[in-house]
């Protein structure tokens, strides 16, 4: 009997977790819920996608969510021009007391160069 109660409780908890609503990070229309930090790159929406336009010779620019998230699944496609170095930050922060608000934390590397480090994860700015 105890095993049945525990199993029933576990199944109920698992069903409750699966029933939670997903919250998309990007609505496909505008940058509501996002903010730009640090550099001077521009971001716009083209064909339901976020497009970043680099400003050569300026510090790294970060487009961040306005809200913090706990557990998440991040899926994305990317296109990048040759010669650029880019990435997607995850579990990163920007605090005034750390290098004047410099975004720091883990980055999923997007690297079209010969070394081809795309997919690598490194610690940005620390």
Task: Please tell me what each predicted stretch does.
Residues 1:
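Structured alpha-helical
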Residues 19-126:
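Carbohydrate-interacting regions of secretory-pathway proteins
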Residues 4-14:
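Sec-dependent N-terminal signal peptides
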């Amino acid at each position: 009997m105890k095993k049945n109660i525990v199993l029933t409780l576990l199944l109920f908890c698992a069903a409750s977790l699966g029933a939670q609503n997903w919250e998309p990070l990007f609505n496909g229309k505008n940058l509501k819920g996002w903010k730009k930090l640090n550099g001077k790159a521009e971001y716009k929406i083209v064909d339901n996608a976020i497009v970043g336009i680099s400003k050569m010779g300026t510090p790294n620019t970060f487009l961040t969510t306005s809200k913090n998230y706990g557990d998440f699944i991040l899926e994305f496609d990317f296109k990048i021009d040759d010669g650029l170095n880019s990435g997607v930050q995850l579990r990163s922060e920007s605090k005034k007391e750390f290098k004047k608000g410099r975004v720091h934390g883990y980055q999923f590397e997007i690297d079209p160069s010969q070394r081809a480090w795309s997919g690598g994860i490194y610690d940005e700015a620390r």
